[in-house]
Design a protein with these regions (language model features):
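Glycine-rich beta-strand-turn "strand-cap" elements at beta-sheet edges
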Residues: 2-3, 40-49, 76-99
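Short, surface-exposed ligand-recognition loops at beta-strand->loop->(often short) alpha-helix junctions
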Residues: 10-18
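Short, well-ordered beta-strand segments in beta-rich or mixed alpha/beta enzyme
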Residues: 2-10, 40-67
Length: 99
């Protein structure tokens, strides 16, 4: 069964556009990772400095392996854009048409 990872990001004041560009560039790499079914970027309707990334993976392990493949310099770049650490949680599908 696939898993879904929900991630929340808050940009430093005035850095929302830069964080959006950064996340969009990372998503391109994530989508190409083994085990990734989908990866989408969302911006909050009421806050252009608040983003969510919704990822669907074959397994938690596939997600973790993809994360390890991100270059440390890219992670350091992200830290300069974030107001607080990103928050991510794994979910499993438990209801709806495909349950």
């Amino acid at each position: 069964m696939a898993i879904t990872r929900l991630n929340a990001f808050h940009a430093n004041p005035g850095r929302g556009a830069a964080l959006r560009r950064f996340l969009a560039s990372v998503i391109t790499d994530v989508r190409a990772a083994p085990g990734c079914r989908s990866c989408e970027l969302y911006e909050a309707l009421d806050d252009p400095e608040h983003f969510a990334v919704v990822e669907v993976w074959e397994t938690v392990e596939a997600h973790k392996a993809a994360g390890k493949a991100i270059a440390p310099a890219r992670l350091e770049e992200a830290m300069t854009l974030l107001a607080s650490p990103a928050v991510g949680t794994y979910f499993r599908h438990v209801g709806g048409a495909d349950a």
